[in-house]
A protein has these predicted regions:
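ATP-dependent adenylation/pyrophosphate-handling site
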Residues: 2-47
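Alpha-helical scaffolding within the catalytic cores
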Residues: 18-20, 53-57
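Metal-dependent de-N-acetylase/amidase catalytic core
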Residues: 1-4, 27, 43-50, 61-62, ...
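Short glycine-rich catalytic loops that host catalytic nucleophiles or stabilize transition states
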Residues: 36, 70-74
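A generic signature of intrinsically disordered, low-complexity regions enriched in glycine/proline
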Residues: 15-16, 31-33, 58-59, 117, ...
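Catalytic metal- and UDP-sugar-binding loop of GT-A-like glycosyltransferases, i.e.
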Residues: 8, 71, 105
Length: 205
């Protein structure tokens, strides 16, 4: 199986699907990641760009990621980018990666970049209908990103209600937490949603 994780920012892939990515890669499946914005200028305690790139590469290598597609769209300003450009960037990743399964943000996430990524991804997965030579995507999943998905503020959108789970075991959860710790400034003390205890508890639900 081939998986493509499409996310707005570095660390979103690990927060949302890190344990599953680790399991799939170690089972011999191919896991690619598409990151729309590889900078973090809007973060309060941001690392330097080269530090963030290093963290992204180290974390994803540990998880067993095959390839990272890196976009340069503006951080927390993706709503200023023409929708078509976002779609075309994801389409290019789909054409090269040839995934069976694509996973991205839920559109009701509180982060607007997550919304823009999700909406663009929804359109990009239809590429095979227009381009018969492009491999058909078999499944399309949303994932939960702690501290963004669980807020459920926008009642106009259906909130995240998972109906598909991947059994990753303690080893997978531990791998996710270790991969997250490779990103500077991401982890927080409990009860923050990006704490080791919270992530462990979420995986047990």
């Amino acid at each position: 199986m081939k998986y493509l994780i499409v996310v707005a920012h570095p660390d979103d892939e690990t927060l949302g699907a890190g344990a599953s990515m680790w399991k799939w890669a170690h089972n011999g499946d191919t896991v690619d990641v598409c990151i729309m914005c590889t900078e973090a200028k809007a973060r309060a305690f941001r690392p330097e760009d080269n530090e963030l790139e290093d963290d992204t590469n180290v974390s994803n290598k540990f998880l067993g990621v095959n390839k990272i597609y890196e976009g340069t769209f503006p951080n927390i300003e993706m709503n200023t980018v023409p929708h078509l450009k976002l779609v075309q960037f994801i389409e290019a990743a789909i054409k090269e990666s040839e995934p069976d399964v694509i996973i991205t943000h839920h559109p009701a996430d509180t982060n607007n970049d997550h919304l823009q990524t999700s909406m663009a991804c929804q359109e990009a997965i239809r590429l095979f209908q227009r381009r018969p030579e492009v491999k058909r995507v078999k499944e399309f999943w949303y994932m939960e990103v702690p501290s963004c998905t669980e807020w459920k503020i926008n009642n106009a959108m259906e909130s995240f209600n998972p109906n598909c789970y991947v059994e990753v075991g303690k080893e997978g959860v531990d791998a996710k937490i270790k991969a997250l710790s490779m990103y500077r400034g991401v982890m927080r003390p409990y009860p923050h949603p990006r704490s080791a205890d919270y992530i462990t508890g979420l995986a047990a639900m």
